[in-house]
Design a protein with these regions (language model features):
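Rhodanese-like catalytic fold shared by cysteine-dependent sulfurtransferases
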Residues: 1-20, 27-61, 70-104
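Short, surface-exposed ligand- or partner-binding patches at beta-edge/loop junctions that are enriched
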Residues: 65
Length: 104
């Protein structure tokens, strides 16, 4: 796992068009807004979260965020243990995000 500031996160995403963004917040949090094109996978859903991860291509880069950066760091750690090659955590999470977002 690599910790990225908002600026680094944006530049890494631009340079890696095959990458995937994952939002690990709760459904209630997501309803307040989310980063465009993010895949929602609630880390609090336990086995459902793990099952969802098992369906993903472990060779791609994953940019993970939550509300403040703690749950996404946990998610990146889990992903690393499952054999994902490249995970990035957004420091400060969605609270610090000033980039484009959408309301589902």
């Amino acid at each position: 796992m690599t910790e990225l500031s908002q600026n680094d996160w944006a530049s890494h995403l631009e340079a890696d068009p095959e990458s995937i963004i994952i939002d690990v917040r709760t459904q209630e949090e997501v309803e307040e807004g989310m980063i465009s094109e993010a895949l929602h996978m609630d880390i609090y859903n336990g086995q459902e979260f793990i099952s969802g991860l098992d369906k993903l291509d472990k060779t791609l880069s994953y940019y993970v965020y939550c509300r403040s950066g703690n749950r996404s760091a946990q998610a990146c750690s889990i992903m690393d243990q499952l054999g994902f090659k490249s995970t990035f955590n957004l420091v400060g999470g969605f609270l610090g995000w000033t980039g484009p977002s959408v309301t589902p």
